[in-house]
């Protein structure tokens, strides 16, 4: 019996998980998404071509990989169908859990309306309706992908839901779709998606029993976890390694190696605590060189220095076996590079994450920069200062680096 290896982001998302998964996919039979929705975005570059994935597992770019969208994901049929249109021959290579919850148009309308009502206290969601979809799930009023197999029955259930919440929708100025319009959409979803809907948990159990190689692909980042992130400025699902298991119906004994994906600096989209944010020239330089624009939202990412306190925290949360250090090349040409080694908090120096992270100040150490690592594929060819930087990050995080990315391209990766 084999075990499932896990890839997780360990900052605030956008760490470069897509490139790592894409690089590793050739060694796996199954690649699986476990949580989130189309608020998450993976960018993968292959031979100069950019692929932006939101719901599809990154294994879709490898013809021999079977791709699974697990029960923990909230699925927008509209978005998924549009994404599927980019690819050919998906039958037999893509499966969607019948237990995954649906993310429908009214969810995004609720999301946007509620954010507007919050004004300056808005969380900064993507507006994709992910929170409202998970809220329906937790309230036990949601609808699942398997219900698409009976579109007439699902339509009737949704109309009843809309009528029961009519006052709420009117307050948010959301127009309720007609039964005819809704049924037409559901029938279209049914026609296209039915061949892909199945019990993916049983499929994965069988795969592991048959010693197939399985890779679980986390979405977003550990500092956005609903329980362990910078609440309330978090996502609506578990983004740590344990969450990937529940989001696919696997047990803890079925977990294999766990790799944490981390940028050589730090970024964050939306509001919330971000201790190492640099609002000056260096932060702007990182944003420009790193092309730090959100894949799902098009919003500019906030940029700053590597936060070793946060990474050490998430390394323990996830039980990491190794790190994959991404976008090291973005720091090419910086004379000095900062690392946050600790925080100042209520007059004390601390090395942990308090629940009120917005009240800390970073304590930095500086290291000398380097000229260029872009495109290097051999560790021995890295500049000495880059090697020292990597070694210091390993020391502070308490986890060894196994992969180093030196450009957006799939093959520009150092394996240690």
UniProtKB/Swiss-Prot annotation:
Alphabetical list of InterPro entries matching this protein: Adenylosuccin_syn_GTP-bd, Adenylosuccin_syn_Lys_AS, Adenylosuccinate_synth_dom1, Adenylosuccinate_synth_dom2, Adenylosuccinate_synth_dom3, Adenylosuccinate_synthetase, P-loop_NTPase
Cofactor(s) for this UniProt protein: Mg(2+)
Binding-site residues for substrate, renumbered to this chain: 295-301
Top EC group: ligase
Catalyzed reaction equations: IMP + L-aspartate + GTP = N(6)-(1,2-dicarboxyethyl)-AMP + GDP + phosphate + 2 H(+)
Protein's pathway: Purine metabolism; AMP biosynthesis via de novo pathway; AMP from IMP: step 1/2
Major location category of this protein: cytoplasm
Keywords of the record: Cytoplasm, GTP-binding, Ligase, Magnesium, Metal-binding, Nucleotide-binding, Purine biosynthesis
Subcellular location: Cytoplasm
Residue positions binding IMP: 14-17, 39-42, 126, 140, 220, 235, 299
GO cellular component, one term: cytoplasm
Cofactor binding note from Swiss-Prot or TrEMBL: Binds 1 Mg(2+) ion per subunit.
Residues that bind GTP: 13-19, 41-43, 301, 327-329, 405-407
Active-site positions on this chain: 14, 42
GO molecular function: adenylosuccinate synthase activity; GTP binding; magnesium ion binding
Residues annotated to bind Mg(2+): 14, 41
EC numbers: 6.3.4.4
GO biological process: 'de novo' AMP biosynthetic process; IMP metabolic process
Self-association state and partner proteins as the record states: Homodimer.
Family: Belongs to the adenylosuccinate synthetase family.
Purpose of the protein: Plays an important role in the de novo pathway of purine nucleotide biosynthesis. Catalyzes the first committed step in the biosynthesis of AMP from IMP.
Protein name as annotated: Adenylosuccinate synthetase
Classification lineage: Bacteria, Pseudomonadati, Campylobacterota, Epsilonproteobacteria, Campylobacterales
Name of the gene: purA
């Amino acid at each position: 019996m084999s075990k499932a290896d896990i890839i997780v982001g360990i900052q605030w998302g956008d760490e470069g998980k897509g490139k790592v998964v894409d690089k590793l996919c050739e060694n796996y039979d199954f690649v699986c998404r476990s949580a989130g929705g189309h608020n998450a975005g993976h960018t993968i570059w292959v031979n100069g071509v950019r692929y932006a994935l939101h719901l599809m597992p990154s294994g879709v770019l490898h013809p021999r990989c079977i791709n699974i969208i697990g029960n923990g994901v909230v699925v927008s049929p509209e978005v998924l169908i549009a994404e599927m249109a980019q690819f050919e021959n998906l039958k037999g290579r893509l499966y969607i859990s019948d237990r995954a919850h649906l993310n429908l148009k009214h969810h995004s309308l609720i999301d946007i309306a509620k954010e507007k009502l919050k004004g300056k206290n808005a969380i900064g969601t993507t507006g994709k309706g992910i929170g409202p979809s998970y809220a329906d799930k937790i309230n036990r009023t949601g609808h699942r992908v398997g219900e698409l197999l009976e579109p007439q029955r699902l339509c009737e259930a949704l109309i009843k839901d809309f009528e029961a919440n009519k006052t709420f929708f009117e307050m948010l100025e959301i127009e309720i779709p007609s039964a005819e319009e809704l049924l037409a959409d559901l029938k279209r979803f049914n026609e296209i998606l039915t061949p892909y809907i199945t019990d993916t948990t049983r499929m994965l159990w069988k795969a592991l029993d048959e010693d197939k190689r399985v890779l679980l692909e986390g979405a977003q980042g550990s500092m956005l976890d609903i329980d362990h992130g910078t609440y309330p400025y978090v996502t609506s699902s578990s983004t740590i390694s344990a969450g990937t298991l529940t989001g696919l119906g696997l047990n803890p004994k079925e977990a294999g190696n766990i790799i944490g994906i981390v940028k050589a600096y730090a970024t964050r989209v939306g509001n919330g605590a971000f201790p190492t944010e640099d609002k000056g020239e260096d932060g702007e330089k990182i944003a420009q060189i790193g092309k730090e624009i959100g894949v799902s939202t098009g919003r500019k990412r906030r940029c700053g220095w590597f936060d070793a306190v946060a990474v050490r925290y998430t390394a323990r949360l996830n039980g990491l076996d190794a790190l994959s250090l991404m976008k090291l090349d973005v720091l090419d040409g910086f004379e000095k590079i900062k690392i946050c080694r600790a925080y100042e908090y209520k007059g004390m120096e601390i090395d942990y994450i308090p629940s009120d992270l917005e009240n800390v100040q970073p304590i930095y150490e500086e290291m000398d920069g380097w000229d260029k690592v872009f495109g290097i594929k051999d560790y021995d060819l890295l500049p000495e200062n880059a090697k020292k930087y990597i070694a210091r990050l390993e020391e502070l995080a308490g986890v060894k680096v196994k992969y180093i990315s030196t450009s957006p391209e799939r093959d520009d990766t150092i394996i240690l």
